[in-house]
């Protein structure tokens, strides 16, 4: 399967099945485009038939000379011989064994607080309450969750725990206790905990910063961008904005953080389709690592992203990608999460086919110890998997998630992006279509554009020119 596109002046050819990416000239681009409609995927290298070469030359004779086309075929044949063009999908058969795999729990999202000191308009957690009551996780429940993770992680050594909310800093003492407990269990069980924290920053102080810099492998700092954008969507419960209080704290934290991982994470909505300006605002504030995610909300919400918004959104990603390249070449570079793409290694096959592992390898834990496939399913009793005392008892739901992969989704099976997005978010699919094996269409279009931009950026930064 071949996917081709032009972005920011770069002609990109992606051989989907092998993962090979080629930045080519217009001639090679046009010849491959002509061939891709006539050559099927192949399990092994082959020679291009002379009759097809003649047909191609005749079709493109008004645009290119015979010599140019002949040389293009030499380059294309070399790529075919190296199995980097017109390759077959070798993973379709693998997925049958993949469905039977034994999974272990590798990561937990601990809902340390079902409470929040902000009242974000788009919050899927309903101001931290998750369709239920306000609650703070006790140390005892959190300890059982870590014990559950250790017991169900098999031979997996590296384990991940994200302190999530609501607002985790509203239960800070328990966060510290659980980190201490986790560290105390590492040597005895041959495990290594990677703790992360997501915070709105309201309660952030020097003591918390120092602890996070010592113990947290990653910290996510929630902020939506420009002051007017942030304060419209992320006010306090009394309606006042949060930007002026939070930004200085986040700047101080990022400076103290040094080269350790962190992300300033925002959400864009229908109200700020020029979200690229918010990304650049983060960069201008001095932040080096950032992400701005599209809101996912029902159509009836005034801030929801509609299908009609897509043309503007896709153009905005293109503009942001071009500015991203420009700033990197000027020595003012930053990291934008959705433009991060590893073309040489990347995730293992299982990850490429099934994504985040929700419901199998990754679970969410409520303040009272209930287990759900991920934080976005919390409160939906149809997806209650069990609790930290009994473990996973609803094996039917777990097995449904185990079967969730790109080949189980009609919309993903023949999509060029399938090995990069891994089928997308199961919660979004369920919320919009009632099935975890469907796909959220608006999200798909944005994801495909982000992948195209990320590949273009790789080509542009590898290009020594300043254009």
Q: What is the role of each PLM region?
A:
Residues 1-38:
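Acidic, low-complexity/disordered tracts enriched in E/D and polar residues
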Residues 64, 71-210, 214-215:
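Conserved alpha-helical substructure of the radical SAM core
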Residues 123-129, 259, 416-420, 430:
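Detector for the c-type heme attachment site
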Residues 142, 146-162, 171-295:
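Radical SAM/AdoMet-radical enzyme domain recognition
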Residues 146-164, 401, 438-467:
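Short Fe-S-cluster ligation motifs
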Residues 228, 232-244, 251, 255-358, ...:
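Radical SAM enzyme [4Fe-4S]-AdoMet core and its adjacent flexible, acidic
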Residues 311-345, 375-422:
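C-terminal accessory region of radical SAM enzymes
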Residues 402-450:
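Cysteine-cluster motifs in flexible loop/terminal segments that predominantly coordinate metals
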């Amino acid at each position: 399967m071949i996917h081709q596109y032009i972005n920011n002046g770069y002609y990109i050819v992606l051989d989907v099945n092998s993962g090979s990416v080629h930045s080519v000239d217009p001639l090679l681009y046009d010849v491959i485009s002509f061939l891709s409609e006539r050559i099927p995927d192949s399990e092994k290298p082959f020679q291009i038939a002379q009759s097809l070469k003649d047909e191609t030359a005749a079709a493109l004779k008004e645009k290119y000379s015979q010599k140019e086309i002949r040389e293009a075929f030499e380059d294309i044949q070399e790529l075919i011989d190296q199995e980097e063009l017109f390759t077959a999908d070798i993973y379709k058969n693998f997925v049958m064994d993949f469905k039977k795999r034994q999974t272990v729990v590798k990561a937990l999202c601990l809902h340390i607080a079902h409470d929040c000191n902000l009242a974000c308009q788009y919050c899927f957690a309903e101001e931290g309450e998750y369709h239920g009551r306000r609650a703070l996780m006790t140390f005892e429940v959190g300890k059982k969750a870590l014990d559950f993770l250790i017991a169900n992680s098999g031979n997996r050594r590296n384990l991940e725990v994200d302190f999530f909310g609501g607002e985790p800093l509203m239960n800070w003492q328990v966060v510290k206790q659980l980190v201490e407990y986790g560290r105390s269990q590492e040597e005895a069980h041959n495990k290594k905990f990677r703790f992360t924290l997501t915070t709105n920053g309201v309660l952030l102080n020097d003591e918390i910063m120092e602890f996070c810099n010592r113990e947290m492998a990653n910290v996510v700092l929630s902020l939506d961008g420009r002051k007017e954008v942030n304060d419209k969507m992320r006010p306090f419960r009394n309606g006042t904005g949060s930007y002026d209080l939070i930004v200085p704290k986040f700047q101080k934290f990022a400076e103290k953080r040094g080269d350790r991982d962190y992300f300033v994470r925002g959400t864009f909505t229908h109200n700020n389709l020029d979200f690229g300006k918010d990304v650049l605002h983060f960069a201008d504030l001095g932040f080096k690592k950032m992400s701005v995610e599209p809101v996912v909300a029902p159509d009836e919400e005034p801030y929801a992203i509609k299908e009609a918004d897509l043309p503007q959104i896709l153009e905005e990603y293109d503009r942001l990608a071009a500015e991203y390249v420009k700033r990197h070449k000027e020595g003012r570079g930053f990291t934008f999460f959705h433009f991060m793409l590893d073309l040489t290694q990347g995730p293992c096959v299982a990850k490429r086919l099934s994504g985040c592992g929700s419901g199998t390898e990754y679970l969410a834990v409520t303040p009272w110890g209930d287990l759900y496939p991920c934080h976005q399913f919390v409160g939906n009793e149809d997806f209650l998997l069990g609790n930290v005392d009994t473990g996973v008892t609803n094996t039917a739901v777990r097995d449904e998630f185990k079967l969730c992969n790109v080949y189980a989704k009609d919309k993903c099976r023949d999509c060029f992006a399938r090995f990069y997005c891994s089928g997308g978010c199961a919660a979004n699919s369920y919320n919009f279509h009632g099935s975890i094996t469907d796909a959220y269409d608006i999200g798909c279009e944005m994801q495909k554009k982000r992948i195209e931009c990320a590949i273009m950026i790789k080509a542009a930064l590898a290009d020594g020119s300043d254009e």
